[in-house]
Amino acid sequence: MAFNRTLAEGINHMPLGRQHYRIWITAAAGFLFEGLDLTIAGGILIALIKAFHLNNTYAGVIGSTALAGYVVGVAIAGWLGDKFGRKFVISYTLLVFTLLTLLSALSWNGIIFGILRFLVGIGVGGESAIVTPYLAEIIPARVRGRLLGLSDAMFTVGAIIASVVNLVVIPAGPWGWRLALVIAGLPAAYVWVIRRNLPESPQWLANHHQLEEAEAVIRQLAPINETSDLDPPIGHPVSSASFKTTEHPSNNLYTLLWSTPYARITAALWIVWFFIELVYYGFLVWLPELLVKHGFTVVKSLEYAFLMNIAALLGGIGASFVQDSRLGRKSSIIFFFFLSGIASYLFSISHTDSGILAAGATLSFLLNGLFSMLYTFTPEQYASWNRSTGQGFASGVGHIGGVIGPLLIGVVLSAIGMAGIFGLFAVFLLVPIVAVLFLRETRAQPVERT
């Protein structure tokens, strides 16, 4: 038969090979460093309050500065990724993160630390905008949900490592928080070096009429000895006619996000991301301090945060497989949001140590499972010409919620307490269910179906 599959279909039918795993590990490492950074930032908040004599409101501002930078980072990186290529952006985002994280360890007051954390957030935001669109265009459809979901689970691996760092390093002395930031920044430098050898997305290359380069990437992904079940193997000569390119009408942001049929998709995704990140980052940044205010020692609060991160890792891994099951993306996401609302309510009414740990671990499991699915589901809603912009702005709007979450806790904690905060979060977690109903199911669909 003639080889007339589109490029995306060729990738979807490709066997999963060594190159896929190499690319996945190198790209997904960005999520690990994001989790490492944000969890260390939450852990050192207690030390910063003492070192810089911060009140709750100012501590909330400090906790939100990286998230504010994240909003800027996703907006810039998403647009750059669609215009200049995924590799262009992914090659530099970790460099920004590494340098600024190391510099933040030298901060001498809260203002300097906040400014540097804002700049760190720009690098972290760039990672979030580009990694999953990049992987979505390279990973075969039948395992895309699992590998993209597991990419986000790397965030929790980083958070678990950070919890150990927080537990061991921060209490060691007044310099502990500085050393924790150095530990967060140094490993990222190595990943940045090897990441420069990643290939460009073949779909992006084809859409920008670089067909020979796209074919070369396909050959790299699927060498002849791994493609014997394709008809014909991708190792055979491929003409430019084999590639289906998607003309993008404009680089105008309004067209990228709000043209038909993307207006409905964009609005729904922004609602979903805003509310989940408001809850998640409020929970993540303030959890150790909230537990201390509940009566736990600093060490005990960090131990509980570590156990909740273990639960979060299991949630991310589990959700990665659930979304590739017959249940599909939409039903899985709705189910997890509903259960998250219940878990948050249970956390709000828990008074015993075991009750707080059980409800908190369940909430961590479900929230991280949701992120694993949303980082798969969101780029699948867009086409290659607006995919990283769509992912970036959805995540960016979400991080506006992520900025509000820690600030909200800092402002109202003394008035309504931990119980009131998590009761409110329970309501916030039910709102996205309605928005998800307006999105299409994408399980096992070619990434370029639109």
Question: What would you call each of these model-derived segments?
Answer:
Residues 1-450:
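Transmembrane-helix signature of 12-pass secondary carriers
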